[in-house]
Amino acid sequence: MNLILFGPPAAGKGTQAKRLVEQRGMVQLSTGDMLRAAIASGSELGQKVKGVLDRGELVTDEIVIALIEDRLPEAEAAGGAIFDGFPRTVPQAQALDAMLARRGQKIDSVLRLKVDEPALIERISKRFAEQGRPDDNPEVFVTRLAAYNAQTAPLLPYYREQGKLTELDGMASVETVAGSIDAALSVVA
């Protein structure tokens, strides 16, 4: 099974993906984690990515798609992938569909975690205070949220038209959201 966890920064995608990895043995393909690993490597690509993220901008499709494609064999071996933070644009979604189709696979479900903006700001402020991630500082977060809203909004109709989109209340407790995800996936499986 291949699924996409969709939602704004701080919606809880990473938390839920980690739970699904533990319970279902799937591989989490988090573009955020992959980009942070590239930065930590100190490579030329990592330095380029750092500059983009520090400004709160989105990394180019080419870079993100290459990172994802490199990890697909691992997901296939595990029996499925959880795409966290990808795709963010319709061209990325189309590229993902094409990548999976070449492997005889598809996206089975898209789960959107809906969270109100004030709650996102509260969550990101707490995470910034606890973890100090540069892309979580309040000024950069506002830019990230605006980019998310502007660039990812067209994905909703893209997946809704395919009958793959399920919208879930991301404002609920971690456990309640987990139950909603399990219920949504039981219909697909």
Swiss-Prot record:
Xref: CDD domains: ADK
Region (NMP): 30-59
Binding site for ATP: A10, A11, G12, K13, G14, T15, R127, A172
Residues at which AMP binds: T31, R36, E57, L58, V59, G85, F86, P87, R88, Q92, R133, R144
Primary localization: cytoplasm
SUPFAM superfamilies: P-loop containing nucleoside triphosphate hydrolases (SSF52540)
Region of interest (LID), ranges: 126-136
Compartment annotation: Cytoplasm
Pathway: Purine metabolism; AMP biosynthesis via salvage pathway; AMP from ADP: step 1/1
GO biological process terms on file: AMP salvage
Catalysed transformations (reactions): AMP + ATP = 2 ADP
Top-tier EC class: transferase
One matching Pfam family: ADK
EC number: 2.7.4.3
An annotated GO cellular component: cytoplasm
Keywords for the protein's UniProt record, in alphabetical order: ATP-binding, Cytoplasm, Kinase, Nucleotide biosynthesis, Nucleotide-binding, Transferase
UniProt cross-references to InterPro entries, sorted A to Z: Adenylat/UMP-CMP_kin, Adenylat_kinase_CS, P-loop_NTPase
GO molecular function, one term: adenylate kinase activity
Keyword Ion transport: no
HAMAP family membership: Adenylate_kinase_Adk (MF_00235)
Known role: Catalyzes the reversible transfer of the terminal phosphate group between ATP and AMP. Plays an important role in cellular energy homeostasis and in adenine nucleotide metabolism.
Domain notes: Consists of three domains, a large central CORE domain and two small peripheral domains, NMPbind and LID, which undergo movements during catalysis. The LID domain closes over the site of phosphoryl transfer upon ATP binding. Assembling and dissambling the active center during each catalytic cycle provides an effective means to prevent ATP hydrolysis.
NCBIfam families: PRK00279.1-3, PRK14527.1, PRK14531.1, PRK14532.1
Quaternary assembly: Monomer.
Entry similarity comment: Belongs to the adenylate kinase family.
Protein's recorded name: Adenylate kinase
Organism expressing this protein natively: Caulobacter sp. (strain K31)
Origin organism lineage: Bacteria, Pseudomonadati, Pseudomonadota, Alphaproteobacteria, Caulobacterales
